[in-house]
Protein backbone atom coordinates (compact mmCIF):
# COMPACT_ATOMS: atom_id res chain seq x y z
CA UNK A 1 0.00 0.00 0.00
CA UNK A 2 2.79 2.43 0.95
CA UNK A 3 5.88 1.17 -0.92
CA UNK A 4 8.05 4.14 0.09
CA UNK A 5 7.16 4.09 3.79
CA UNK A 6 9.95 1.63 4.69
CA UNK A 7 10.32 1.93 8.48
CA UNK A 8 8.65 5.32 8.81
CA UNK A 9 5.09 4.11 9.52
CA UNK A 10 3.22 1.32 11.32
CA UNK A 11 -0.54 0.85 11.26
CA UNK A 12 -3.61 -1.34 11.21
CA UNK A 13 -6.15 -1.31 8.37
CA UNK A 14 -8.85 -3.38 6.77
CA UNK A 15 -12.46 -3.70 5.66
CA UNK A 16 -15.80 -4.15 7.41
CA UNK A 17 -18.46 -6.15 5.54
CA UNK A 18 -21.88 -7.61 6.27
CA UNK A 19 -22.71 -11.32 6.02
CA UNK A 20 -23.26 -11.00 2.24
CA UNK A 21 -19.91 -9.29 1.76
CA UNK A 22 -21.36 -5.81 1.24
CA UNK A 23 -19.39 -2.91 2.77
CA UNK A 24 -20.52 -1.34 6.04
CA UNK A 25 -19.63 2.35 6.02
CA UNK A 26 -19.80 4.75 8.96
CA UNK A 27 -18.84 2.48 11.86
CA UNK A 28 -16.22 3.72 14.30
CA UNK A 29 -13.02 1.70 14.57
CA UNK A 30 -11.02 2.09 17.77
CA UNK A 31 -7.55 0.83 18.67
CA UNK A 32 -6.48 0.93 22.31
CA UNK A 33 -4.20 -0.40 25.05
CA UNK A 34 -1.38 1.99 24.18
CA UNK A 35 1.09 2.55 27.06
CA UNK A 36 -0.23 6.10 27.61
CA UNK A 37 -3.88 4.95 27.69
CA UNK A 38 -4.72 6.63 24.38
CA UNK A 39 -7.54 5.26 22.20
CA UNK A 40 -7.26 6.06 18.49
CA UNK A 41 -10.31 6.19 16.27
CA UNK A 42 -11.42 6.41 12.64
CA UNK A 43 -14.51 5.63 10.56
CA UNK A 44 -15.04 2.85 8.05
CA UNK A 45 -15.16 4.13 4.50
CA UNK A 46 -12.49 6.83 4.93
CA UNK A 47 -9.69 4.79 3.30
CA UNK A 48 -10.99 3.42 -0.02
CA UNK A 49 -7.45 2.32 -0.93
CA UNK A 50 -8.36 -0.88 1.00
CA UNK A 51 -11.91 -1.12 -0.41
CA UNK A 52 -15.23 0.69 -0.06
CA UNK A 53 -15.43 0.20 3.72
CA UNK A 54 -11.69 0.68 4.27
CA UNK A 55 -10.24 2.03 7.51
CA UNK A 56 -6.71 2.77 8.69
CA UNK A 57 -5.22 3.80 12.04
CA UNK A 58 -1.59 4.78 12.58
CA UNK A 59 0.03 2.87 15.44
CA UNK A 60 3.50 4.43 15.37
CA UNK A 61 5.87 6.65 13.40
CA UNK A 62 8.48 5.22 12.89
CA UNK A 63 8.05 1.45 13.31
CA UNK A 64 8.84 0.54 16.91
CA UNK A 65 8.42 -2.18 19.49
CA UNK A 66 4.97 -2.08 21.10
CA UNK A 67 5.41 -3.83 24.46
CA UNK A 68 1.88 -5.18 24.89
CA UNK A 69 -0.94 -6.39 22.64
CA UNK A 70 -3.29 -3.70 21.34
CA UNK A 71 -7.03 -4.16 20.86
CA UNK A 72 -9.33 -3.16 18.01
CA UNK A 73 -13.11 -2.81 18.24
CA UNK A 74 -16.06 -1.64 16.11
CA UNK A 75 -18.69 0.77 17.46
CA UNK A 76 -21.92 2.14 16.00
CA UNK A 77 -22.76 5.82 15.46
CA UNK A 78 -23.70 6.12 19.18
CA UNK A 79 -20.31 4.67 20.17
CA UNK A 80 -21.93 1.44 21.40
CA UNK A 81 -19.66 -1.57 20.74
CA UNK A 82 -20.86 -3.85 17.94
CA UNK A 83 -17.87 -6.20 18.15
CA UNK A 84 -15.72 -7.71 20.84
CA UNK A 85 -12.27 -6.28 21.45
CA UNK A 86 -9.85 -8.25 19.29
CA UNK A 87 -6.27 -8.27 20.61
CA UNK A 88 -3.26 -8.29 18.29
CA UNK A 89 0.50 -7.88 18.73
CA UNK A 90 2.17 -5.53 16.23
CA UNK A 91 5.52 -6.60 14.81
CA UNK A 92 8.51 -4.28 14.97
CA UNK A 93 9.62 -5.54 11.54
CA UNK A 94 9.64 -2.93 8.78
CA UNK A 95 8.44 -5.59 6.33
CA UNK A 96 5.36 -6.25 8.50
CA UNK A 97 4.42 -2.69 9.45
CA UNK A 98 0.87 -2.90 8.00
CA UNK A 99 -1.48 -5.17 9.94
CA UNK A 100 -4.64 -6.10 8.00
CA UNK A 101 -7.72 -6.94 10.08
CA UNK A 102 -11.01 -7.45 8.26
CA UNK A 103 -14.36 -7.70 10.04
CA UNK A 104 -17.41 -9.58 8.76
CA UNK A 105 -20.83 -9.34 10.38
CA UNK A 106 -22.08 -12.85 11.13
CA UNK A 107 -25.63 -12.05 12.28
Task: Give the location of each predicted region.
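Exposed beta-strand and adjacent loop surfaces of beta-rich binding modules
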Residues: 11, 26-28, 69
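Beta-strand-rich domain onsets/edges
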Residues: 1-22
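A short, solvent-exposed beta-strand micro-motif common in secreted/extracellular proteins
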Residues: 66-77
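Predominantly extracellular/luminal cell-surface or secreted proteins
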Residues: 17, 32-34, 75
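Extracellular beta-sheet/turn segments enriched in Thr/Pro/Gly and aliphatic residues
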Residues: 1-4, 82-107
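Short, acidic Ser/Thr/Gly-rich low-complexity loop/linker segments typical of extracellular
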Residues: 35-60, 81, 86-88
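Short, ordered, surface-exposed loop/turn motifs in non-cytosolic proteins
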Residues: 21-38
Amino acid sequence: IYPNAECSWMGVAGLVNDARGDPIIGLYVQVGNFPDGEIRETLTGLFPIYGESGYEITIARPVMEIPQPLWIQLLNESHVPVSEKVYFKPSNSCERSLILINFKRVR
